[in-house]
């Protein structure tokens, strides 16, 4: 019985921590939606530019 209670307590603690993390992450995104979008676009641009740079290297 003690083991069952311990497992339930751990699961409850994990769910609370996960919920808090999710909410704090959502708040950050809502506070800075433009900066998040800029970061994502910059990452996407970097990914797009990598194959082009490789092709230029091969042409030279």
Curated annotation (Swiss-Prot):
Signal sequence, start to end: 1-26
Protein location: Secreted
Tissue: Expressed by the venom gland.
GO terms for cellular component: extracellular region
Top-rank lineage group of the source organism: Eukaryota
UniProt keyword list: Secreted, Signal
Record-stated family: Belongs to the non-disulfide-bridged peptide (NDBP) superfamily.
Protein known as: Venom protein 4.1
Organism: Lychas mucronatus
